[in-house]
Amino acid sequence: MELNAGGVIAYISSSSSASSPASCHSEGSENSFQSSSSSVPSSPNSSNCDANGNPKNADISSIDGVLKSDRTDCPVKTGKTSAPGMTKSHSGMTKFSGMVLLCKVCGDVASGFHYGVHACEGCKGFFRRSIQQNIQYKKCLKNENCSIMRMNRNRCQQCRFKKCLSVGMSRDAVRFGRIPKREKQRMLIEMQSAMKTMMNTQFSGHLQNDTLAEQHDQSALPAQEQLRPKSQLEQENIKNTPSDFAKEEVIGMVTRAHKDTFLYNQEHRENSSESMPPQRGERIPRNMEQYNLNQDHRGSGIHNHFPCSERQQHLSGQYKGRNIMHYPNGHAVCIANGHCMNFSSAYTQRVCDRIPVGGCSQTENRNSYLCNTGGRMHLVCPMSKSPYVDPQKSGHEIWEEFSMSFTPAVKEVVEFAKRIPGFRDLSQHDQVNLLKAGTFEVLMVRFASLFDAKERTVTFLSGKKYSVDDLHSMGAGDLLSSMFEFSEKLNALQLSDEEMSLFTAVVLVSADRSGIENVNSVEALQETLIRALRTLIMKNHPNEASIFTKLLLKLPDLRSLNNMHSEELLAFKVHP
């Protein structure tokens, strides 16, 4: 009697009277079963079966005893099953909803789902050895038409291997089913190499486009220029290709923008010894003097980094609920809905007209989070002057003091963004959305140097250092710890000013920000900045190609920090 390999045996007893078991057949792991009138026992030679292979007793207990005694001569390993509802008995049988699954190759009881099909331990090991050892079996003497069953599966190995492939066993599943650690590392290296090749292919495509444009321009050159030796022209073009010109120009412009707009970095280096940090708990006068826009202030030192620390002009009327902070250079910062944007005065008015007025109270201008522990209010953000705030101050005064110290840093981010090549070509709507969503991440990158991993200290903008333990005792929570961890990893890369400026631009210009209208334009600018960053990294670190990959992996970390920051602000309520 020939067994139908790959079937599933189901035992059904509707009454106490004797009845023959019905067999169901399944193709693969699909759960569609087809009834058949012929019974398919798991072991025809069992002592509990008659000459036709049918069980002597039809009750479920005796049949279960047949199955349990069937494979006692061949111990198998039990493992996890892949499908829900699938169980495995102590003898190695795989059951699905009470039905026993058979090996797709030989019809024996399947021990699990191996290499893409349900198979027994014998066929699983046979197929694995065949693939791993690349065994070439002897040719079949019966024209490769042998019937593979449990009793004769070892007679013709070529037909057995052919049957394994025909029922769906996968060669790749043998090679990559359970990947060792070294193999995974090797595959990751290959994937990174493939990514580099793909990027180089994209770069070559851009170079071809540049070459076509160059040929078009050369067609309009004078005849004498066209008659110059081709080799001489090629040598000149190799030295400075149009693509290289573009990348170098982007690198130079972004670097200059970063240096010119990151005033804290310059003043901290040049005037740290001249500037005196404010005392802890320093109060700001309640009666704010209105700032005279016509007055010229050209001070130096870290105090000048906060030009509106004692000067602020509040507008009323149509801008009620929005704080407009003016600066001597004719620019202003609009703080609305917790976001800070810096543009010219006319530009600020246009932007503010688009921002809803509702829900813009002082308590919603949350550019850092406050902690209320034991009745004492503390400000624990490095972008402020000090983590300490006088507990006698009202919530309004606390936010006012913080916004005064924090807003100029945001102003610098906006100035930096405006000087990124191509940023101002984006729509006004997309510029605002990129600044809203990315300002915190840019500041996180810029002020990463404030975190000292060795001393476990954080330097605030006032110049004072505080230990992490002290900040935690003041109420700093998981956000500050995550900021410290990120800064430690970023500082370990030891990026130059050029590399830091390009990375900051890449952080800001992200096409997956919410609310972007022209995604293609933002993506094009983002790709330009990423290519420039990669060129700079490869130039400065030819033997450390992983730095570029590590930098790109910092982008999701920054996004997580941004989300944590937003959650902290939304969860906190200022108590006046």
Curated annotation (Swiss-Prot):
Listed Gene3D superfamilies: Erythroid Transcription Factor GATA-1, subunit A, Retinoid X Receptor
Entries under PROSITE patterns matching the protein: NR_LBD (PS51843), NUCLEAR_REC_DBD_1 (PS00031), NUCLEAR_REC_DBD_2 (PS51030)
Location in the cell: Nucleus; Cytoplasm
Residue intervals passing through the bilayer: none
Binding annotation for heme: 381, 565
A GO biological-process term: negative regulation of inflammatory response
PTM-bearing positions, type Phosphoserine: 46
Region Disordered, annotated ranges: 13-90, 215-246, 263-282
Disruption phenotype: Mice exhibit an altered circadian metabolism and feeding schedule, eating more and utilizing more carbohydrates as fuel during their nocturnal/sleep period. Increased expression of circadian clock core genes and genes involved in lipid metabolism and fatty-acid oxidation in the skeletal muscle. Mice exhibit decreased wakefulness and increased slow-wave sleep and rapid eye movement sleep during the dark phase (active period). Altered expression in the brain of core circadian clock genes and genes involved in sleep induction and wakefulness.
Induction pattern: Activated by the CLOCK-BMAL1 heterodimer and DBP and repressed by CRY1.
Modified residues (N6-acetyllysine): 162-163
Region ranges (Interaction with ZNHIT1): 394-576
Tissues expressing this chain: Ubiquitous. Expressed abundantly in skeletal muscle and brown adipose tissue. Expressed during skeletal muscle myogenesis.
DNA-binding region, residue range(s): 100-176
Biased composition (Basic and acidic residues): 227-237, 263-272
Protein name: Nuclear receptor subfamily 1 group D member 2
Species this protein is from: Mus musculus
Recorded name of the encoding gene: Nr1d2
